[in-house]
């Protein structure tokens, strides 16, 4: 069965100009940190300071799934190129075809933590990456095959970690805000919404991920992190064992499905339905989840404790999701009704 989400159905295939619909079931792409040897973006440079804190600059937007958004960026004053915003990527990454096209200076190989294992990949130097009115200098970017990225590159947490990142799921829009200046990407991000907002405090993970502890699955407390590039949410096997132990029947039936990562590895995951999932005060009710021991959990030190990767399927349950990196806060706003259709995954 062709993999297709509600977001794709609403937009139509033609709207996905250039983003690979074969997609990555998980966006633990380009590094849940490009491991050792990848330095974070150096000093931030405002290319064109907006005249007021309320001024916004539009960015050409491409969308895939609910939160996989692509912005037009310039690399060393050339472009525009489409880079996908990915909160699961520790480092900003670039496609091999673009790195070769721009003849970017090579850097030493770096260790990249993929979905099932760590791998060594080449990296290049980007002197200046411009995103609308903001420019970031001295980026060390891992390089991946373009077919695996499905875009010209990924904007990772080394850049995103300076912003408040907001996803307007209903309007299929996103915005980045820094020092009161908002950069709008697609749709019409509106202020003054009456949607109730309740922020959850977060801690910072090894590679900049926002780690949440106010999350429970069937009453079991878990450590969770958000990966906006991941199509589906995935729990680790420690979580699976914990919730199975809490059930008198020992657990529900599940079936195996393959999942794939940007570094090319694949592994088998179990699909099952949990009775209750809570994000702070938000009760999501019965929810389908995948379970697998991703390398990402081990990388973040979460292999032996119940943990959950929150992907686009859960983010899409809300009207708005905001990751305020400077203030270590995540806000889920406007919980929507649970869709009645089953999760569409390869093999159905």
Model regions: which residues?
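Pepsin/retropepsin-fold aspartyl endopeptidases
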Residues: 2-348
């Amino acid at each position: 069965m062709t993999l297709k989400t509600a977001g794709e159905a609403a937009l139509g295939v033609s709207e996905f100009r250039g983003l690979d619909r074969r997609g990555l079931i998980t966006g633990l792409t380009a590094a849940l940190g490009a491991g050792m040897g990848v330095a974070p973006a150096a000093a931030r440079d405002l290319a064109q300071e907006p005249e007021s804190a309320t001024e916004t600059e539009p960015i050409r937007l491409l969308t895939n799934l609910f939160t996989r958004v692509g912005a037009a960026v310039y690399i060393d004053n050339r472009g525009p190129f489409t880079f996908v915003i990915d909160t699961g990527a520790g480092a900003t990454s670039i496609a091999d075809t673009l790195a070769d096209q721009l003849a970017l200076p090579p850097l030493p190989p770096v260790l990249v933590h993929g979905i099932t294992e760590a791998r060594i990949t080449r990296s290049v130097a980007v002197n200046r990456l411009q995103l609308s009115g903001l420019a970031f200098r001295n980026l060390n970017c891992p390089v991946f095959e373009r077919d695996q990225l499905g875009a010209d590159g990924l904007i990772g947490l080394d850049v995103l970690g300076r912003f408040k990142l907001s996803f307007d799921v209903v309007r299929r829009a996103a915005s980045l805000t820094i020092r009161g200046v908002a950069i709008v990407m697609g749709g019409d991000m509106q202020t003054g919404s009456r949607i109730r907002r309740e922020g959850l405090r977060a801690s910072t993970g090894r590679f900049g991920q926002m780690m949440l502890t106010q999350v429970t699955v069937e009453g079991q407390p878990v450590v969770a992190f958000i990966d906006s590039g991941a199509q589906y949410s995935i729990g680790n096997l420690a979580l699976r064992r914990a919730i199975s132990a809490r059930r008198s029947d020992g657990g529900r039936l599940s079936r195996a499905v393959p999942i794939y990562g940007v570094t090319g590895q694949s592994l088998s995951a179990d699909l099952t339905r949990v009775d209750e999932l809570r994000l702070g005060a938000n009760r999501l009710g019965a929810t389908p989840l995948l379970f697998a021991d991703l390398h990402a959990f081990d990388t973040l030190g979460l292999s032996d404790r119940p943990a959950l990767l929150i992907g686009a399927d859960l983010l899409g349950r809300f009207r708005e999701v905001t990751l305020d990196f400077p203030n270590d806060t995540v806000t889920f706003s406007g919980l929507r009704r649970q869709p009645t259709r089953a999760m569409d995954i390869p093999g159905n």
